[in-house]
Amino acid sequence: MKRMIALDGAQGEGGGQILRSALSLSMITGQPFTITGIRAGRAKPGLLRQHLTAVKAATEICRATVEGAELGSQRLVFRPGTVRGGDYRFAIGSAGSSTLVLQTVLPALWFADGPSRVEVSGGTDNPSAPPADFIRRVLEPLLAKMGIHQQTTLLRHGFYPAGGGVVATEVSPVASFNTLQLGERGNIVQMRGEVLLAGVPRHVAEREIATLVGSFSLHEQNIHNLPRDQGSGNTVSLEVESENITERFFIVGEKRVSAEVVAAQLVKEVKRYLASPAAVGEYLADQLVLPMALAGAGEFTVAHPSCHLLTNIAVVERFLSVRFSLVEADGVTRVSIE
């Protein structure tokens, strides 16, 4: 019998990423775990609908036995079974992030006995979670280089707080992992701005695009009007294509916050990324830790290691026999497998 791993949900940033990473790694390695203090660092601790959906999805995909899988629970015991490929559908029942549920179960399906399709309904454009276009245009091309083949499709947008969005991913078992080397970003090839609107006046998007154009030379600028029943909501994205990597930054519009202020916040984030020679942005760095650990080698550079990144690394090192090295030099932090 494999040893039970004990995790403290309050460690590091104390959010839901500890639980999501633990579920992924438990399904992959077959190691059971207990986590206490789930989301202890959040204003509303314990399992929310999004986290509970991730637990239930993981349970179904590997026939796990679970204790504590209920709303508000701050303790969970998860004993995994065997990961099975198949056609899965999960509903969050709120505007909780669909992509974070996918992020939990897809790595396990890289080791399944056949191809899979996973569809999740819930929120698709959330302030604190990667949107589907980030997964599709930034993460998945990098995963493909690593030998991981999955394809995400956004079927319907669902803005906070209404939800109602649908995201689906098709994924195949991985034959072998390749290493990823992302030490240098390279020169910028082009930049693209995009605004999504649902039930919001078009002039809001035009003002947001104007703010982006005031700071960057954009190769493309697009405004997409979505059906009103997918809103109301608004997101602004700016994609930076460089020689070695494409990064995408986004922000979700807020009520009673002007279009100019919303777009200016995004401009500030992109300028911070471009001011550093690092290849990888803060959010992408979090996404690369697990596949890099599974490959057993590789490296990337990031401007500053976030608490989120350090917490994720700590969880990965509890389940896998890998050790990460973080070395600061020349204005970047080089993250690699020792």
UniProtKB/Swiss-Prot annotation:
Catalytic activity: a 3'-end 3'-phospho-ribonucleotide-RNA + ATP = a 3'-end 2',3'-cyclophospho-ribonucleotide-RNA + AMP + diphosphate
Top class in the EC scheme: ligase
Binding-site residues for ATP, renumbered to this chain: 103, 283-287
EC number: 6.5.1.4
Gene Ontology cellular component annotations, sorted alphabetically: cytoplasm
Transmembrane residue ranges: none
Subcellular location: Cytoplasm
A GO BP annotation: RNA processing
Claim: Ligase is one of the keywords in the record: yes
GO molecular function: ATP binding; RNA-3'-phosphate cyclase activity
Superkingdom of source: Bacteria
Xref: SUPFAM superfamilies: EPT/RTPC-like, RNA 3'-terminal phosphate cyclase, RPTC, insert domain
Active site: 308 (tele-amp-histidine intermediate)
Keyword terms, alphabetized: ATP-binding, Cytoplasm, Ligase, Nucleotide-binding
InterPro entries: RNA3'-term_phos_cycl_insert, RNA3'_phos_cyclase_dom, RNA3'_phos_cyclase_dom_sf, RNA3'_term_phos_cyc, RNA3'_term_phos_cyc_type_1, RNA3'_term_phos_cycl-like_CS, RNA3'P_cycl/enolpyr_Trfase_a/b, RPTC_insert
Protein's UniProt keywords contain Iron: no
Family: Belongs to the RNA 3'-terminal cyclase family. Type 1 subfamily.
PANTHER family: RNA 3' TERMINAL PHOSPHATE CYCLASE, RNA 3'-TERMINAL PHOSPHATE CYCLASE
Role this protein plays: Catalyzes the conversion of 3'-phosphate to a 2',3'-cyclic phosphodiester at the end of RNA. The mechanism of action of the enzyme occurs in 3 steps: (A) adenylation of the enzyme by ATP; (B) transfer of adenylate to an RNA-N3'P to produce RNA-N3'PP5'A; (C) and attack of the adjacent 2'-hydroxyl on the 3'-phosphorus in the diester linkage to produce the cyclic end product. The biological role of this enzyme is unknown but it is likely to function in some aspects of cellular RNA processing.
Protein name as it appears in the record: RNA 3'-terminal phosphate cyclase
